[in-house]
C-alpha cells in the first residue's frame, strides 16, 4: 500500500528572528530539497519545516497517493519512464501550492523541465552525501527500485557520476554526513538566511 501523504504541524509563533526573516524572504516560494536516495531529504526536510513553521511534503509520498501504488509497484508495473512522467507532474503541482519544504526523489532534478520549474518557483537545496554514506544508509531499506542490482555500490557510483553535475546547479549545497540531524538543520537554516537575507556586498 502507498504511504499516506503527510505534513508536519507548523510552529510559526516559535520562530527565531532569523527563521522569521527566512520565511518572509521566501514569500510564496517553497524550499526544495534535492539529492541522492539516502541523503536525508525527508528526515532533514521534516525537521527544517518544523523549525521554519512551514508544511512539509514528500514528493514520493504524493506520487504514491496520486497513483494509489507504491513506487516499487509503479516501477514494476509501468517502468521508470512512466514514473518519471508522473513525478514531474506531481512536483509541478506542488511547486504551485505556496510556501513549504518539499523533499524530492533522487532522479527528479535530472529532468530539465523540473529543474527549470524549481529554478523559477523555488529555492533549491542539495544535500550532498558521499557514496559510502549513501550505501550504508540505503542498505537498510528494501524499497529502492534502482538498487535492485547485483552491484549496489557500482550503481550508486554511476548515479553519482550522472547526477552530481546537475545537482550542483542548486541554489544552496549542504554536506549530508553522519552527524546529528539538528546540526544539518542548523546549517540549512544558516545557509538559507545567508542566501535570502544577507546584505549584498558594498561596492
Curated annotation (Swiss-Prot):
Catalyzed reactions per annotation: shikimate + ATP = 3-phosphoshikimate + ADP + H(+)
InterPro entries (alphabetical): P-loop_NTPase, Shikimate/glucono_kinase, Shikimate_kinase/TSH1, Shikimate_kinase_CS
CDD domains found in the cross-reference section: SK
GO molecular function per UniProt: ATP binding; magnesium ion binding; shikimate kinase activity
Pathway: Metabolic intermediate biosynthesis; chorismate biosynthesis; chorismate from D-erythrose 4-phosphate and phosphoenolpyruvate: step 5/7
Residues binding Mg(2+), per UniProt: 42
Protein's cellular compartments: Cytoplasm
Keyword terms: Amino-acid biosynthesis, Aromatic amino acid biosynthesis, ATP-binding, Cytoplasm, Kinase, Magnesium, Metal-binding, Nucleotide-binding, Transferase
Highest taxon of source: Bacteria
Binding site for ATP: 38-43, 144
EC number, UniProt record: 2.7.1.71
Cofactor: Mg(2+)
Tagged with keyword Transmembrane helix: no
Annotated cofactor note: Binds 1 Mg(2+) ion per subunit.
Main location: cytoplasm
GO biological process, one term: aromatic amino acid family biosynthetic process
GO cellular component: cytosol
Sites where the protein binds substrate: 60, 84, 106, 163
Disulfide bonds: none
SUBUNIT field: Monomer.
Family: Belongs to the shikimate kinase family.
Biological role stated in the UniProt entry: Catalyzes the specific phosphorylation of the 3-hydroxyl group of shikimic acid using ATP as a cosubstrate.
Protein name as it appears in the record: Shikimate kinase
Lineage summary: Bacteria, Pseudomonadati, Pseudomonadota, Alphaproteobacteria, Hyphomicrobiales
Amino acid at each position: 500500500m502507498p504511504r499516506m501523504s503527510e505534513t508536519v504541524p507548523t510552529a510559526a509563533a516559535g520562530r527565531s528572528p532569523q527563521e522569521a526573516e527566512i520565511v518572509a524572504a521566501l514569500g510564496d516560494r517553497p524550499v526544495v530539497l534535492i539529492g541522492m536516495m539516502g541523503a536525508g531529504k525527508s528526515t532533514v526536510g521534516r525537521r527544517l519545516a518544523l523549525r521554519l513553521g512551514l508544511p512539509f511534503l514528500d514528493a514520493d509520498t504524493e506520487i504514491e497517493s496520486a497513483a494509489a501504488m507504491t513506487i516499487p509497484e509503479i516501477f514494476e508495473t509501468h517502468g521508470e519512464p512512466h514514473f518519471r512522467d508522473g513525478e514531474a507532474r506531481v512536483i509541478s503541482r506542488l511547486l504551485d501550492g505556496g510556501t513549504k519544504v518539499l523533499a524530492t526523489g533522487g532522479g527528479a532534478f535530472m529532468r530539465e523541465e523540473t529543474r527549470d520549474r524549481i529554478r523559477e518557483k523555488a529555492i533549491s537545496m542539495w544535500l550532498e552525501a558521499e557514496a559510502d554514506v549513501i550505501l550504508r544508509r540505503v542498505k537498510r531499506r528494501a524499497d529502492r527500485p534502482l538498487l535492485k542490482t547485483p552491484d549496489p555500490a557500482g550503481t550508486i557510483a554511476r548515479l553519482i557520476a550522472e547526477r552530481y553535475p546537475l545537482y550542483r546547479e542548486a541554489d544552496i549545497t549542504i554536506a549530508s554526513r553522519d552527524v546529528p540531524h539538528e546540526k544539518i538543520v542548523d546549517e540549512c537554516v544558516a545557509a538559507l538566511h545567508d542566501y535570502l537575507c544577507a546584505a549584498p556586498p558594498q561596492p
